[in-house]
């Protein structure tokens, strides 16, 4: 399995001949190396409905005939837009041909803002546990620190955890460091930083602050082989 980071909260997973993208915010993301027109994707996983996470889901799903997996209300909304979806909810898990997906809670909001400034409720935000080839990835989505991260760490052997560090909208570096300790992940990668001035952070300093040398600040496009 290969897992790569592509700016903001965009993570790409390549496993068993499939390409999976989490929160594909590409258009308007000044940090990404991806192109919507060139990206080939089989599955899209969404943590919540905010525009900087749904991103280019509709175009990618339609041009690739990709499956979108998301919390129930968000998935339902996207199905009305003409894409294939699999609806899930927090605490639920499902075994797909390409891997096992489980949604965890996240402490945040979830809504999608239409071009006419209508705000659409898109359910509860979530984190994602993805397991394939005997390896588990945790994408926390947008979230505050919460104590059940201890339980997530106790019940899962997490190989790579992607944690937001931007502050303001999510937990900042100090809280993310506590989350890293509670999750007990083998490797912790910071996400959701430096896309906008209000979430400017130093990912290298965060990675170096973690005990056990498990922090790793990935450059855009850089991958981890598992």
From Swiss-Prot:
SMART domains according to UniProt: Lactamase_B (SM00849)
Pfam families, per database record: Lactamase_B_2 (PF12706)
Superkingdom per UniProt: Bacteria
Keyword entries, A-Z: Hydrolase
Any one GO molecular function term: hydrolase activity
HAMAP family, per database record: UPF0173
Similarity remark: Belongs to the UPF0173 family.
Protein name as it appears in the record: UPF0173 metal-dependent hydrolase BH3178
Source organism per UniProt: Halalkalibacterium halodurans (strain ATCC BAA-125 / DSM 18197 / FERM 7344 / JCM 9153 / C-125) (Bacillus halodurans)
Upper taxonomic lineage: Bacteria, Bacillati, Bacillota, Bacilli, Bacillales
């Amino acid at each position: 399995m290969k897992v790569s980071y592509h700016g903001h909260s965009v993570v790409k997973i390549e496993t068993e001949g499939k390409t999976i993208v989490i929160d594909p915010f590409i258009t308007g993301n000044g940090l990404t190396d991806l192109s919507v027109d060139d990206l080939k994707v089989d599955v899209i996983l969404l943590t919540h409905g905010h525009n900087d996470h749904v991103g280019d889901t509709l175009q990618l799903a339609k041009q690739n005939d990709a499956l979108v997996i998301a919390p129930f209300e968000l998935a339902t909304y996207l199905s009305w837009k003409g894409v294939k979806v699999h609806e899930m909810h927090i605490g639920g898990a499902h075994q797909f041909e390409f891997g096992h997906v489980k949604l965890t809670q996240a402490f945040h909001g979830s809504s999608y803002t239409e071009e006419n400034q209508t705000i659409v409720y898109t359910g509860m935000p979530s984190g994602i546990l993805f397991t394939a080839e005997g390896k588990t990835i945790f994408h926390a989505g947008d979230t505050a620190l919460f104590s059940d991260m201890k339980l997530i760490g106790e019940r899962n052997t997490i190989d790579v955890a992607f944690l937001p560090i931007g502050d303001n909208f999510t937990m900042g570096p100090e809280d993310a460091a506590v989350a890293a300790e509670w999750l007990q992940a083998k490797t912790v990668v910071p996400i959701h930083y430096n896309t906008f001035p209000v979430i400017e952070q130093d990912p290298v300093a965060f990675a170096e602050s973690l005990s056990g040398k498990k922090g790793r600040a990935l450059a855009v496009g850089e991958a981890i082989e598992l």
